[in-house]
Amino acid sequence: MSASRFIKCVTVGDGAVGKTCLLISYTSNTFPTDYVPTVFDNFSANVVVNGATVNLGLWDTAGQEDYNRLRPLSYRGADVFILAFSLISKASYENVSKKWIPELKHYAPGVPIVLVGTKLDLRDDKQFFIDHPGAVPITTAQGEELKKLIGAPAYIECSSKTQENVKGVFDAAIRVVLQPPKQKKKKSKAQKACSIL
């Protein structure tokens, strides 16, 4: 039996968007009720996706600005990033292209990014928006638009609280590494012609 491939998956995104909850929900099928900024040990497990077994290593990062200099140290060797924003936070959505994409392109160019909208359960919760009048929901169409803008191969919306699509996030991350999307090649006129001398 051949050894399974190791995939390093790093979560990034603004503080309080639900990165740690997503990881805890995926690895333990439980939802932490208290907000504790980034308390998730690195985690590794064998996962089967499309018949292939991989050893998935999960790394959590702190989104707060206090960690801007420390956070990139965890990017080394990353095979894929899960870039999370909250579906109920316009600021976290805007920071995907303003802050996170420039940071990832600088420290880890060429590493694929799976874009993830978190807190799906709250997007349709009318009471949440009554209690938080400044909150603006992000639509699926806006998420898809952002995916195209940043060139991410996948966009997934999930809820760590209800577990909806949580497994799908990590399956997508594994798939992006095992079957990278084909890059569109632009052929120049010189490449099309064949000359024999």
From Swiss-Prot:
Keyword terms: Cytoplasm, GTP-binding, Lipoprotein, Membrane, Methylation, Nucleotide-binding, Prenylation
Tissue: Ubiquitous.
Propeptide feature ranges: 195-197
Membrane topology: Peripheral membrane protein
Subcellular location: Cytoplasm; Membrane
A GO term, aspect molecular function: GTP binding
GO BP: abscisic acid-activated signaling pathway; auxin-activated signaling pathway; small GTPase-mediated signal transduction
Key word NADP present: no
Gene3D superfamilies according to UniProt: P-loop containing nucleotide triphosphate hydrolases
Residues that hold GTP according to the record: 13-20, 60-64, 118-121
Motif Effector region location, chain numbering: 35-43
Disulfide bonds: none
InterPro entries, per the entry: P-loop_NTPase, Small_GTP-bd, Small_GTPase, Small_GTPase_Rho
Residues bearing the modification Cysteine methyl ester: 194
Residues anchoring lipid (S-geranylgeranyl cysteine): 194
GO cellular component, one term: nucleus
Family classification: Belongs to the small GTPase superfamily. Rho family.
NCBIfam families attached to this UniProt entry: small_GTP
Subunit structure of this chain's protein: Interacts with SPK1.
Function: Inactive GDP-bound Rho GTPases reside in the cytosol, are found in a complex with Rho GDP-dissociation inhibitors (Rho GDIs), and are released from the GDI protein in order to translocate to membranes upon activation.
Entry protein name: Rac-like GTP-binding protein ARAC1
The gene coding this protein: ARAC1
